[in-house]
């Protein structure tokens, strides 16, 4: 889908940002590539449920994506609408979900600056999530400043939209706790105007890559994208890593660490059937080809309605653009309301 320039939404009278009767949830993604099954299991299925239970905001965090893709802005730009299309295909409803483009809400950047004064460099350096990411990216002592402080930007996002609930995995808990610390410090120092968010801890284990590696990633070539065809899914599944010691169907095999069974745990709607397959595989008598063919059927069953919705929205690209522009306008109104409260609490000039 070609990218259309997204203008910063024209401000109207801000809508009140009082604590909603239902929880307000903020979640989102960095638009650096197409979404895949890891996103579906880890967050998208939960978001589809949450949009009926909460006031759901989904952030296309293109500014955060630039902290480690600053030399590839075109990639980030092109993926904004691509990821929005993935959202709609996965089942997010424009009438229930507010989709916001981060770079089109300048209030987020201003709030980030105020929050930077409330956290120390040493505290940021101790964040285990950031430490792990710095090591993974091999930055050493050459960490871009924008990347180093992105947890503060995340805190500003959460506070600006008044989120009371934030879905996170175990690895993201330190990030959310840092947000809570910043919010508490702001409220104690100035005035209690910001909501302190709570964590909704994901119970879904992270899907491994098709090659058995810990992370599924399109850039690593070990992912099944939400937009993959049935034939592409079949080809990728047949090439999946399994137990290297399971050479013949009659051999006992290992289920633990076998991504085929991890995927079945995540997507097969019949746990009893999965358990029976595991028992048979462990005992010997179940070949990799047979269990992979079953996984192909399961995954294509999961992806079939997603493909149908994708085709509908691909025929109506204006609907995808409206999802983003109207959501961003709504998001900016909420962020402006919060920023106004922040400025008054800080007694800034003119407030």
Curated annotation (Swiss-Prot):
InterPro entries: aa-tRNA-synth_I_CS, aa-tRNA-synth_Ic, Rossmann-like_a/b/a_fold, Trp-tRNA-ligase, Trp-tRNA_synthetase. One of its GO terms (molecular function) is tryptophan-tRNA ligase activity. The keyword Aminoacyl-tRNA synthetase applies. One of its GO terms (biological process) is tryptophanyl-tRNA aminoacylation. It comes from the Bacteria. It is an enzyme of class 6 (ligase). GO terms for cellular component: cytoplasm. Residues 1-24 are annotated as: Disordered. It catalyses: tRNA(Trp) + L-tryptophan + ATP = L-tryptophyl-tRNA(Trp) + AMP + diphosphate + H(+). Homodimer. Forms a complex with nos; one homodimer of trpS2 binds one homodimer of nos. This protein may not be involved in protein biosynthesis. NCBIfam families: trpS (TIGR00233). This is Tryptophan--tRNA ligase 2. It comes from Deinococcus radiodurans (strain ATCC 13939 / DSM 20539 / JCM 16871 / CCUG 27074 / LMG 4051 / NBRC 15346 / NCIMB 9279 / VKM B-1422 / R1). The gene is trpS2.
């Amino acid at each position: 889908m070609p990218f259309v320039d997204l203008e910063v939404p024209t401000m109207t009278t801000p809508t009140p940002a009082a604590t909603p009767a239902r929880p307000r949830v903020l979640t989102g993604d960095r638009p650096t590539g197409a979404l895949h099954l890891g996103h579906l299991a880890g967050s998208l299925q939960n978001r589809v449920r949450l949009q009926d239970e909460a006031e759901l905001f989904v952030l296309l965090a293109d500014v955060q994506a630039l902290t480690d893709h600053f030399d590839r802005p075109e990639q980030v730009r092109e993926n904004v609408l691509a990821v929005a299309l993935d959202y709609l295909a996965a089942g997010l409803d424009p009438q229930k979900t507010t989709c916001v483009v981060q770079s089109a809400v300048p209030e987020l950047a201003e709030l980030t600056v105020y929050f930077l004064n409330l956290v120390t460099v040493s505290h940021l350096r101790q964040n285990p999530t950031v430490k792990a990411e710095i090591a993974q990216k091999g930055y050493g002592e050459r960490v871009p400043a924008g990347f180093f402080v992105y947890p503060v930007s995340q805190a500003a996002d959460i506070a600006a939209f008044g989120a009371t609930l934030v879905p996170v995995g175990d690895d993201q808990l330190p990030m959310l706790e840092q947000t809570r610390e910043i919010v508490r410090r702001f409220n104690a120092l100035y005035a209690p105007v910001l909501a302190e968010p709570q964590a909704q801890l994901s119970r879904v284990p992270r899907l491994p890559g098709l090659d058995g590696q810990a992370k599924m990633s399109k850039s690593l070539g070990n992912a099944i994208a939400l937009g993959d065809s049935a034939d592409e899914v079949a080809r990728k599944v047949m090439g999946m890593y399994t137990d290297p010691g399971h050479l013949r169907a009659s051999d006992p095999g290992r289920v633990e660490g076998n991504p085929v069974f991890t995927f079945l745990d995540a997507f097969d709607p019949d746990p009893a059937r999965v358990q029976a397959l595991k028992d048979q595989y462990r005992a010997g008598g179940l070949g990799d080809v047979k269990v992979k063919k079953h996984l192909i059927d399961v995954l294509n069953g999961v992806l079939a309605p997603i493909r149908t919705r994708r085709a509908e929205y691909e025929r109506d690209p204006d609907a995808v653009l409206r999802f983003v522009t109207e959501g961003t306008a709504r998001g900016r109104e909420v962020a402006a309301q919060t920023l106004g409260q922040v400025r008054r609490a800080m007694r800034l000039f003119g407030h």
